[in-house]
Amino acid sequence: MRAVVQRVKGASVKVDGDLISSVGPGLCVLVGIHKSDTKKDIDWLVNKLLTLKLFGDEGGKRWSKNVVDSGHEILCVSQFTLYYSLKGTKLDFHNAMPATQSQPFYEEFLSS
């Protein structure tokens, strides 16, 4: 699995103008799933996202709290393009998990 993690003051996902999901302060995470990923990869990434110390404390000390300690939220967005490779002038996505497998895998990731 691959993740692009960004601290945000707020983030949202809209499709055709309709709000799908939103969060206040916290993290926005783009998640790519490799064709060979397993439950072990889900567990590792979930643990990493929940324990990364990316936020400051009340005393101003930077990088001292994780998303759970600071009471923030996480917005996850599935992004198969994180597993592209460049073949000449074309993008190749053969390393990304196929949609039929990745949807239940992603849902398992979200519920973890």
Task: Label every model-predicted segment.
Residues 1-89, 104-112:
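N-terminal, polar/charged subdomain of small-to-medium soluble alpha/beta proteins
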Residues 87-101:
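A charged helix-plus-loop insertion that forms the helical arch/lid used to bind
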